[in-house]
């Protein structure tokens, strides 16, 4: 039997994961100086600097920091860059179409514009960069990391016709200097005001299946995952995984040509399982077990999705993770 608020939770996901979580508007109050996040007056229902992981219909779209209404931002170019980054974050396919080949927005995984507990929150994230990236085998800047998301989660490589001829596709792909990347960086740096470089972010890494609870990939059953998906997930995501629309709101596709490509982090079994386990369903995250989340993840990542054409350049200096099921193993 489904939990008592399942249908309500489904409604919230439909509306909250659609990407555009706030209207396009300009701040109405006079500008005031920026202040560190820890001094910002958060409402009682918020958990520290984040939205609580459990929420209600009334609070499902709350934002501790909303640059479209925050009076601390003025009419300067710097403030407008933050606002543009927020718009790209919440409607990536619409606001950064040249680098978003599918229908995935940053907001689809990083809920509440990157400000929700246990939903891959990004508050303070700028303080951790540069950071070593195992897949690339080198240190990444924040902008490098954003580029990686465009290439993989937003499938910017989907427009490449000849991956062997760099001259034919170089102009199609984002760089750290691209204006969309710089705008997203400005928004994330704004979310990170008050955090010193190297800051310990206690909410980082919460979306992980504990290593001791990970089921070997070969023991996971896509058919069992499908049964769970049909019972637990279709209210919001539909039987075809493409999302059920209510008005102009729709969850992002979980597979197919408009989903993330097979080089994305969500294309890894345990990574996606951690998101499912702790961030879903939208109003009642955490009601699925570790096993259920992993089985559902195995089902989703047994589906076809766009191919990342440069997988052969990944993990050249680090071992290939055992849950990277779309990669060719030596």
Say what each PLM segment does.
Residues 77-113, 200-246, 251, 269:
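Sequence/structural segment immediately N-terminal to covalent heme-attachment motifs in c-type
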Residues 83-87, 107, 144, 182, ...:
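Solvent-exposed, polar/charged alpha-helical surfaces in well-ordered, non-transmembrane soluble domains
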